Design a protein with these regions (language model features):
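PRPP-dependent phosphoribosyltransferase catalytic core
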Residues: 1-53, 61-62, 116-305
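Conserved beta-strand elements of the Class I
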Residues: 54-56, 94-95
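Short, charged N-terminal beta->alpha structural module
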Residues: 58-72
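Short helix-loop-beta junction
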Residues: 70-80
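Short acidic low-complexity segments
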Residues: 80-92
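Ser/Thr-glycine-rich phosphate-binding loops at phosphate-binding pockets of nucleotides
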Residues: 97-106
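A short secondary-structure junction signal
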Residues: 105-110, 137-141
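Glycine-rich, phosphate-binding/catalytic loops in enzymes
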Residues: 112-114
Length: 305
């Protein structure tokens, strides 16, 4: 922790430590947190319903889904004395379970493929997460309904979140639960192309926050402004270390669209999501000195797949 915070300006270090401590106490989720949510879901579901349901193991990238299925299976064995069904196409009720959903893009990629090529002609599909974001729910529903219509199949779609839904809609940006700086708090250095960081917004509206309203994650407006400013500055510095940074690499976390990044505020025992600000996870102290990854010491080094 001390090595990580020493990379910030001296006047900011104590503030960054305090804000990071507040954030992680609220937003770092352990395996116990996951198990409690999934165990409650299993206990609240009738045995017959579980017998008639198949969970999907169709994630194209990563291991989060298989990890969630392992927890669900253990819970079902302990509660109902039988294992869950996985990829069982004799059923017509399916559940896609994941841990944290940020943009919903991965969910859509996985399920668009499944709907077109593997789903029965008639079935129900429940998309379940432990933590998610309001925009992700909108994106998933919109995109998958379109895919279902294209497929010509009769698939009823529903979404559920067992934990908390975090606010990140544009219209609610002043009280969002993700990092979303005011424009005046953002200073893109001259050595970076500013175009990639300019967010799109409806005509006549500012892309950044225009004020502050308390949210679940952010309770103090001045602290939020200062923390976001610091995270942007250091995130831009990290990007400047790279010779050819990916277009999706943004100071506040990876995002395919233009802007400063997703600004995620959720961290888990499994990994540090790349949708969170770069300062938390980018870098690798095990790399040789010539490698840009050696130039920043991460607080939570990310596991890649």
């Amino acid at each position: 922790m001390l090595k990580w915070v020493s990379q910030f300006d001296e006047d900011d270090r104590l503030f960054v430590l305090k804000q990071t401590d507040l954030l992680l106490k609220k937003q770092y989720f352990t395996k116990d947190n996951f198990e409690i949510l999934l165990d409650n879901a299993i206990k609240d579901t009738a045995s017959k319903t579980l017998h008639d349901t198949s969970f999907l193991d169709v994630q194209l990238d990563g291991k989060s889904q298989s990890d969630m299925l392992e927890i669900l299976n253990n819970s079902c064995l302990n509660t109902h004395n039988f294992p869950i069904n996985i990829n069982n196409y004799t059923k017509n009720r399916f559940v896609y379970q994941d841990d944290v959903v940020f943009t919903g893009d991965r969910v859509c990629r996985d399920l668009e493929e499944w709907i077109i090529h593997s789903a029965p002609h008639q079935c129900s599909l429940l998309i379940a997460s432990l933590y998610t974001h309001t925009s992700a729910l909108y994106n998933i529903e919109k995109n998958l309904i379109q895919t279902i219509n294209i497929s010509g199949k009769s698939i009823s779609l529903s979404l559920v979140c067992f934990g908390k839904i975090y606010e990140n809609k544009f219209i609610m940006r002043n009280q969002s639960d993700v990092f979303w700086p005011k424009e005046e708090n953002v200073n893109i250095p001259n050595n970076l192309d500013p175009i990639r960081f300019i967010s799109t917004a409806p005509q006549g509206q500012a892309p950044g926050r225009t004020g502050f309203a308390a949210s679940y994650v952010f309770e103090n407006g001045n602290d939020r402004d200062r923390f976001e400013k610091i995270l942007c500055e250091k995130g831009c510095y990290i990007i400047s270390l790279c010779n050819n940074p990916a277009a999706s690499m943004k100071p506040l976390g990876y995002k395919t669209y233009r802007g400063l990044g997703f600004g995620g505020t959720i961290f888990t025992y499994r990994n540090c999501p790349n949708n969170t600000p770069l300062v938390f996870w980018w870098g690798n102290p095990n790399m040789e000195d010539w490698n840009p990854l050696s130039k920043w010491y991460p607080l939570m080094m990310r596991k890649t797949y």
